[in-house]
From Swiss-Prot:
It comes from Zymomonas mobilis subsp. mobilis (strain ATCC 31821 / ZM4 / CP4). The gene is dapF. Homodimer. Disulfide bonds: none annotated. This is Diaminopimelate epimerase. The lineage of its organism: Bacteria, Pseudomonadati, Pseudomonadota, Alphaproteobacteria, Sphingomonadales. Pathway: Amino-acid biosynthesis; L-lysine biosynthesis via DAP pathway; DL-2,6-diaminopimelate from LL-2,6-diaminopimelate: step 1/1. The active site is at 74 (proton donor), 209 (proton acceptor). Substrate binds at residues 13, 46, 65, 75-76, 149, 182, 200-201, 210-211. It catalyses: (2S,6S)-2,6-diaminopimelate = meso-2,6-diaminopimelate.
């Protein structure tokens, strides 16, 4: 039996998009891995399933990592939804409702309020999340933020000088993080201007991470490295972050439709 899929990306963070509004899709870890495999499948960082919404939500969104794990939130994926549908939408996710609107940049998303207490990240035990008293070699004293999924943010002198593939993997799987962790490194490049990289939980090094950019903005504000609307440069391009009067994090950036294809479910069983 064949099915249609769509490829999209947000700053190079690429997705398989499956529209399940008319025909529901029962995803599982093995199938998500098979579809996401860049050598034997379609290939992506994450798999997005758009379904019907309930109550306040126009649509629902499931997000599956390339390793087969399901995750609560993905900022770049969220920006893709209004672009895919061609309209503003309220999206139901495992992290709650998200307001995603079309904008001149591509899409603008209200990512909600950050969660900052140790048990909301979550961490394995209580500690200050502003400057955590831990270190992994030269990466020291990160700030922890939950933006629908868990992040740590390290401030460094040069994001390109860090052996990030090795250290990111090490930190992701540390016992301090019972649900594993997304790892971000950031440097200040100017007034309200940052440069960052992300090791994404379940996906590895990615060209962009929307929730990572949100978490990095929150960490930078908490550390008084930025004061207002901030431009953040990632390997795949630029996002603009701000905080509204209600303490919600607002993310603006591009989302790009690439192509539509067809495949046979039997190829991935």
């Amino acid at each position: 039996m064949t099915f249609s899929f769509h490829k999209m990306h947000g700053l190079g963070n690429d997705f398989i998009v499956l529209d399940a509004r008319k025909n529901p899709i029962q995803m599982n870890p093995a199938l998500a891995q098979a579809l996401s495999n860049r050598h034997t499948g379609i290939g992506c960082d994450q798999l997005i399933i758009i379904g019907n919404g309930k109550n306040q939500a126009d649509v629902s969104m499931e997000i599956w990592n390339a390793d087969g794990s399901e995750v609560e939130a993905c900022g770049n994926a969220t920006r893709c939804v209004p672009v895919f549908l061609g309209r503003d939408v309220i999206i139901s996710t495992a992290a709650g409702l998200l307001d995603a609107r079309l904008s001149d940049e591509g899409a603008c998303v209200d990512m909600g309020r950050p969660r900052l207490s140790w048990d909301e990240i979550p961490l394995a035990y209580a500690m200050d999340t502003l400057s955590m008293p831990v270190a992994w070699e030269d990466l020291k004293e990160p700030t922890a933020v939950n933006m629908g999924n868990p992040h740590v943010v390290f401030v460094v002198d040069d994001v390109d000088a860090v052996d990030f593939g090795r250290l990111g993997n090490m930190i992701e799987h540390d016992q301090l993080f019972p649900e594993r962790i997304n790892v971000n490194i950031v440097m200040v490049t100017g007034k309200d201007h940052l440069k960052m990289r992300t090791w994404e939980r379940g996906a590895g090094l990615t060209r962009a991470c929307g929730t990572g950019a949100c978490a990095t903005f929150v960490a930078a504000k908490r550390r008084r490295l930025v004061s207002g609307k901030t431009q953040i440069d990632l390997p795949g391009g630029r996002l603009v972050l701000d905080e509204n009067s209600e303490g919600h994090i607002i993310m603006r950036g591009p989302a790009t439709y690439v192509f539509k294809g067809e495949a046979d479910w039997a190829s991935f069983s």
